[in-house]
Amino acid sequence: GMLMAATALLAENARPDEAQVKDALGGVLCRCTGYRKIIQAVMAAHDFDAEPLRAETGSAVGTRLNRLDGEEKVLGTDLFGDDVAGQGALVLKVIRSPYHRASFSFGDTGGLLVTTPGLIKILTASDIPGRNLHGVIPDTVDQPVFAVAETRFKGEAIAAVVGDADAVDKFDVSDFPVTWTERPAYLTPEKALADNAPLIHANRPGNILMNGIVQRGDLAAGFAHKDATIAEGDFITGFVEHGYIEPEAGLAQRVGDRLEMHVCTQSPYMDRDDTAAILGIAK
């Protein structure tokens, strides 16, 4: 995003000032940087037009490295998460809660397998051999792989059907044998923090994930400063979803005594550790 926005700007204006660079990059939201180095680099880009900066041969610092997947990416032949499954691979479809909060019970899941050709397995919490929890941050892991008896949010997973691709594709999730009982939901922080609100997790008193300390200086002295500008109001930011460039998909297969996964992820080592804990196997 940064490169595309900067390239578009430099194509129109080879020597932009800081305000112009900020304006051009303003639509690129990035949590990984303070923007300062990027802004400076775009403003200085014209200095390298005549003679590109090249590292000395054999220099460890500054030497340009070829990306392992660079050629495949450029040619469009690289394989993404939804491209790696071979012919005949089994496919999984997750059954999710249609309610914000509900209790549920399963019906005749064994009968579903008998009457639905191509389905070979139904997975529920009882099939989890290890820890029925997952989450990116180890200290706050509390999300079940499959909910047990009650779901806590709309879309929470309760089961998965596994089978050949055609059967799973045609399977209507409304045919899954489950009975739902919708329960009162608390959809705002204020309601969830109320004294009479039920606990989302038994180990989270008051429905509070964690407490922290924010330190600040002398607010009154700051406001009293002659150069201080005070702005008051209610400010709301919208929800921003990452713009994935591929489906969230992947492949898992057994290779010897190892489980090998090909998935799209930002945190492969955390995924590895989580999967090992869920399956009750060594990393």
Identify what each model region corresponds to.
Residues 46-205:
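Flexible, low-hydrophobicity surface segments
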Residues 29, 81-84, 148-151, 239-242, ...:
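A generic local secondary-structure boundary/capping motif
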Residues 17, 165, 280-283:
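Helix N-cap / loop-to-helix initiation motif
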Residues 78, 219-279:
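Conserved beta-alpha junction segments in alpha/beta enzyme cores
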Residues 111-114, 273-283:
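Phosphate/pyrophosphate-binding loops at sites that engage ATP/ADP/AMP, CoA/4′-phosphopantetheine
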Residues 1-56:
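Ferredoxin-type iron-sulfur electron-transfer modules in oxidoreductases and energy-metabolism complexes
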Residues 2, 17-21, 34-41, 70-76, ...:
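General structural feature for long, well-ordered alpha-helical segments within catalytic domains
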Residues 27, 88-92, 116-120, 148, ...:
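Short coil/turn connectors at secondary-structure junctions
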